Amino acid sequence: MNNEVIRLPLITLRGMTILPRMVIRFDISRKKSIKAVEYAMKHERRVFLVPQKTPEPVEPKLDEIYECGTVCEIKQVIKIPGGPAQVTVEGLYKASADKYELENPEINYAMTTEVDESGGFEDNVEREAWRKVVIKAVEDYCNSSGIKSANTVRRLKTIKDDAGFVYEATAETLDDFMLREEILATDDIEEKYFILSHSIMNEADINDYKEFIISKIKTRISEQQKEYFINEQIRLLKEELGGEDEDEELD
């Protein structure tokens, strides 16, 4: 791990948290973000990506930006004429921002320090227990979402370091950027696993209940349609019977 403070171009993300190990493509349209990418492409391709606390500010202030983010390597930049640029990055490591420089009219910068995540559980039994809890939660989540879990579980089982395991599982299951940021910012490895497993279980429960609600709605609609069909049949039958009575009276 490098304890050196490194000054990197900064991109604040709206509604997104990028984790170490993630490879992701996203659009950028703000002038400072585009300039940050251009600068990074000329200087080792590295940039500090951190989410804004809320997506609304176009130029967020210090208290509107999280302090924990991810140092990423830019893999590809596609410039779309008259539109946003598409940037593909790979998350390298977790870093904390010791200072933000937001006054520059062209580019925002962050003074970053890498966070040491090389440690983990000291007890292998505890590690394996937590990993099995997470894998079971991932399997339940995938089943509740209609997603095949085999490849995800197989990939998780190959990851040796504890933090990397958490980030991979988080990226596969949790979309909420604030949850991702909470997991990223948490230093204690057991707490990371707790937040992750609890969040995945909660998502699986939501998916299950969503299916229950959908099934209930479909049943009610089916009953209403059946009732409507029966009522229509009765109405038509009454009209036909009424028509026959009138004919008899005319005779």
What are these regions (language model features)?
Residues 1-251:
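N-terminal low-complexity, acidic/polar interaction/targeting segments
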